[in-house]
C-alpha cells in the first residue's frame, strides 16, 4: 500500500477484514507472510506500531472515567515517545464541552467521535479506521471525511472498512477486495469505475460480486 492513498478494505461478512486489521495492530500474529512499514517488520516492533492510529468499530473505555481524563491518560502514556499532537478533530467535534462527562453517559455517536479523535491524536503516519462513520450524525460524518482527505493529502496511508459504502465514495482512492482471507484484487477506484461502468462504490462492488468478469480481477500490489 502506498502513502498518500486511502484504501477501502471490502469483502463479504467473514472474509477476513477484521483479522487483517488485527494483524496490523499486533493483536493477531499471521500464520504466514510479513507485514512491513517503511521496510521494517511490524512483528514485535511496538515503536513502529506506535505510528499507526486506530479507530475501532466499537470503542471500549473505562465507564467511570471522564472524557477529559481519558485524553490526559493517553497523553501521559505517550509522553516522550510522540511529540506531535493533532487536535483538529477534538476542536471540530467540541470535545472540550464534554470533558467532564463520564464515558458511561455518552451516546454511541459521541463515543465514535471520541474514538476518531484518539485515532488522529498523535499524528500517526498510518490510520486504520474500522467502520468510522457508524453511529455518527451527518455533520460529524462530513467533518470526519474532510479530515481523512486532508490527512491523505499530507501523504498519510489510510485503511478504511465500512458496510456503508456510500460513505467511502468520496474518500477512497483504491479498493482492496478480499474473500475468505484471500486477496482478489487491489485496484485504483477510478480504474474500477471505468471498467465496471458504475460511479457509486456500492453499485460497483455489487456488480463485481454478481459478475466477476465485469472488471479485471488481476492482482496488483497493494
Language-model features, listed with the residues they occupy:
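Conserved ABC ATPase signature
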Residues: 102-109
Amino acid at each position: 500500500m502506498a502513502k498518500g492513498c486511502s484504501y477501502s478494505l471490502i469483502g463479504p461478512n467473514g472474509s477476513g477484514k477484521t483479522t487483517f486489521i488485527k494483524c496490523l495492530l499486533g493483536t493477531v500474529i499471521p500464520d504466514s507472510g510479513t507485514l512491513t512499514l517503511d521496510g521494517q517488520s511490524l512483528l514485535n516492533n511496538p515503536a513502529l506500531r506506535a505510528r499507526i492510529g486506530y479507530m475501532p468499530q466499537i470503542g471500549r473505555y473505562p465507564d467511570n472515567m471522564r472524557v477529559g481524563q481519558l485524553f490526559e491518560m493517553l497523553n501521559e502514556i505517550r509522553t516522550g515517545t510522540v511529540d506531535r499532537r493533532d487536535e483538529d478533530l477534538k476542536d471540530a467535534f467540541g470535545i472540550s464541552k464534554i470533558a467532564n462527562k463520564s464515558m458511561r453517559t455518552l451516546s454511541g455517536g459521541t463515543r465514535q467521535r471520541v474514538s476518531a479523535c484518539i485515532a488522529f491524536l498523535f499524528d500517526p503516519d498510518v490510520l486504520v479506521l474500522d467502520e468510522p462513520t457508524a453511529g455518527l450524525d451527518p455533520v460529524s460524518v462530513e467533518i470526519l471525511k474532510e479530515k481523512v482527505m486532508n490527512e491523505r493529502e499530507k501523504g498519510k496511508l489510510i485503511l478504511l472498512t465500512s458496510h456503508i459504502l456510500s460513505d467511502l465514495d468520496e474518500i477512497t482512492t483504491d479498493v482492496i477486495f478480499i474473500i475468505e482471507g484471500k486477496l482478489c484484487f487491489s485496484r485504483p477506484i477510478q480504474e474500477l469505475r471505468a471498467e465496471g461502468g458504475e460511479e457509486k462504490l456500492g453499485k460497483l462492488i455489487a456488480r463485481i460480486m454478481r459478475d466477476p468478469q465485469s472488471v479485471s480481477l488481476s492482482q496488483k500490489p497493494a
